[in-house]
Design a protein with these regions (language model features):
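Acidic/polar surface patches and capping/hinge elements
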Residues: 9-467
Length: 467
């Protein structure tokens, strides 16, 4: 913590941000949020933190608002005195999350309110005076309201409750997840352990992780504000219609069209399917473990996007980032992930590519089984690849790519920590993991990485200049 002159409280350390990122991970798991919804939530939360710290002249941050799509109108910083960035950020975060999580569990909102109050109290202890606290709280409240007003126009509510009728054509994707894949075994009054009928997935209560730990508490939230992930229904078919945070539109970094569906020998699609099947027919245990490590199913590790947010949370103390720098890293990473899901979903439900399990069982091997259950949305491009490409582009841009690290994001759910030589090495592994898992053809992961790097580059352009 760095103490500055002029009698002001010291600049807060990065824990002020990682406290919020850890709370977000807990929330996404406990509320059972699907990947797109979780990404939207985290991006608005990240923006609230960034804009809160940017209001403090000491932070060196400028507001991102003028450069965001559909530029939100943010309140002017008070001119009659200084504000404390940590207090502004905590209050803005509370306002934003209390609204976005209003249909969640009561315990979720209590955690948000308690953390905000604790951070304000810490800043008082650090020496922020009553007048500055009052100005900061008022500005944080106004800032949170402005972000919510912008969020209300992103198209999310227009997609709630809209019926989607699957095409039910052989050449179009159809959800293969069924209720009998998930067989509950009650562990306690708070949760169920869910095993799957897939023989390739070994299930132990000590190592449940992505293999199927689903919270099973009563949840009143309907589809309007906080829908829970349901693997037996197509996930968010209209998500590609949402307004991106930074991209001018969802197609700004669109991948090339995938090959047309064809079961004929010699066709491009048949060749793609054959190459996939040949690569996974005999899968060594080491590659199976890669597939499981990056599965990131909802509830287990908090979705694919939150895997990278967990990495961000690890990097903040390791790099000794203060709160403003941590808020910038968190905000840009979460917005890159959010835009990645919007762009990915636009193409997924446009191309409607049949998943490998369906194609292989039809054409090559009726007995084929995947390593993990196939996700409930179309195949192309790979969402893991797009959002990983986007997140890593931001991480490399802000932290460099020479940092070795150990990814411990899934230790608490039974997966061993995994070392990586660089962010780019992890990015390549997560992309290939989707082939090993049996849920993507190779073009989906390669084109997905390209799309993700394009998205991440556009988001990274918002970062403050580096010396």
């Amino acid at each position: 913590m760095v103490t500055l002159a002029c009698g002001r409280a010291p600049v807060p350390d990065g824990a002020y941000v990682t406290d919020w990122s850890r709370l977000a991970l807990i929330t996404v798991r406990s509320e059972r949020l699907g990947p797109p919804v979780a990404a939207r939530l985290s991006a608005y939360a990240g923006l609230a933190l960034h804009e809160g710290y940017a209001a403090d002249v000491r932070s060196g941050l400028g507001s991102l608002a003028p450069r965001l799509t559909g530029a939100p109108v943010m309140p002017a910083v008070p001119s009659e005195g200084t504000v404390d960035g940590a207090i502004v950020a905590a209050v803005a975060e509370r306002v934003v999350l209390d609204s976005l999580l209003r249909d969640g569990f009561a315990s979720t909102v209590r955690r948000v309110d308690s953390l905000a109050a604790a951070q304000v109290a810490r800043r008082r202890t650090d020496g922020v005076g009553d007048d500055e606290v009052a100005r900061s709280e008022a500005h944080g409240t106004a800032l949170g309201a402005a972000i919510l007003a912008w969020a209300a126009t992103d198209g999310f509510f227009a997609t709630r409750g809209r019926e989607w009728t699957p095409p039910r054509r052989r050449d179009q994707w159809e959800n293969t997840a069924t209720l009998d894949q998930y067989v509950p075994q009650t562990l306690s009054g708070q949760s169920d352990f869910v095993s799957t009928t897939n023989p390739n997935v070994r299930l132990d209560t000590e190592t449940a992780s992505e293999k199927g730990l689903f919270t099973n508490r009563p949840k009143a939230a309907g589809p309007t504000t906080l829908p829970a992930f349901n693997p037996t229904r197509p996930t968010e078919p209209y998500w590609g219609e949402l307004r991106p945070f930074v991209l001018p539109d969802a197609d700004a970094c669109a991948p090339p069209p995938p090959p047309a569906y064809d079961e004929a020998l010699g066709s491009a699609f048949h060749a793609m399917g054959r190459a996939f099947y040949d690569s996974v027919r005999v899968l060594p245990d080491s590659l199976r473990q890669v597939a499981l490590f990056w599965a990131d199913n909802p509830v287990a590790t908090g979705t694919p996007g939150f895997h990278w947010i967990s990495v961000v949370t690890q990097m903040i103390p390791r790099r000794g980032l203060d709160a403003p720098a941590a808020a910038e890293l968190y905000a840009l990473t979460t917005m890159a992930i959010a835009d990645a899901f919007i762009g990915t979903w636009r193409e997924k439900y446009r191309s409607m590519v049949v998943r490998p399990v369906a194609y292989v069982q039809r054409v090559f091997d009726p007995a084929y089984r995947t390593v993990i259950p196939t996700p409930p949305f179309p195949e192309y491009p790979s969402g893991h690849s797009v959002q990983s490409g986007a997140a890593v582009e931001v991480l490399i841009g802000l932290l460099g790519d020479t940092l070795t690290y150990v990814d411990s994001s899934q230790v608490d759910v039974g997966q061993p920590a995994r070392p990586f030589a660089s962010f780019s090495a992890a990015r390549e592994e997560v992309a290939w993991s989707r082939v090993y898992a049996g849920v993507h053809y190779l073009p989906a992961v390669l084109d997905g990485l390209t799309q993700g790097r394009c998205i991440g580059g556009q988001v990274l352009a918002l970062a403050r200049p580096r010396g």
